[in-house]
């Protein structure tokens, strides 16, 4: 498999929404899910710190990871909505997207990365633990996971 990483543009919103729906259907084991609402992705394309990393096979988006930079009392990067389309899973794409986000965090001198993972998403939980993320807080149906880099 020959895929590359890139940065999403506004024109990629529909495909990103399709992958988001696919992710939700997998996690919740139902077809009855809603995608992003109109305008939900706009903040990732307005030139601020937030952006979406994508994996491409030729010109087809096969995966994405939303990256949010938070400048609060403690600065951190929040990783949101990682989705790899089914036929490309278990090929290191999710790992590469996360590694890309970690490199970005180091580039902008932010040392903490966190995200939420559904407890039922065992494959994702194993991946994150393998990459050095630890459960920081049990929040009912999901965990808050953190890694200091």
What are these regions (language model features)?
Residues 3, 7-80, 85, 98-99, ...:
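Acetyl-CoA-dependent GNAT
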Residues 12, 81-83, 87-88, 92, ...:
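Conserved functional loop/turn residues at catalytic and ligand-binding sites
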Residues 84, 90-103, 126-130:
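Conserved acetyl-CoA-binding loop-helix of GNAT-fold acetyltransferases
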């Amino acid at each position: 498999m020959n895929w590359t990483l890139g940065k999403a543009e506004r024109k990629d919103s529909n495909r990103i929404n399709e992958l988001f729906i696919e992710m939700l259907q997998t996690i919740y084991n139902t077809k009855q899910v809603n995608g992003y609402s109109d305008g939900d992705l706009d903040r990732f394309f307005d030139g601020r710190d937030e952006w979406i990393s994508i994996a491409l096979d030729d010109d087809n988006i096969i995966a994405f990871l939303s990256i949010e930079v938070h400048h609060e009392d403690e600065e951190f990067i929040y990783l949101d909505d990682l989705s790899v389309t089914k036929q490309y899973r278990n090929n290191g794409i999710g790992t590469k997207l996360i590694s890309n986000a970690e490199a970005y965090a180091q580039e902008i001198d932010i040392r903490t990365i966190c995200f939420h993972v559904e407890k039922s998403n065992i494959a994702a939980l194993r991946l994150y633990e393998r990459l050095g993320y630890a459960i920081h807080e049990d929040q009912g149906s999901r965990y808050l996971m953190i890694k200091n880099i």
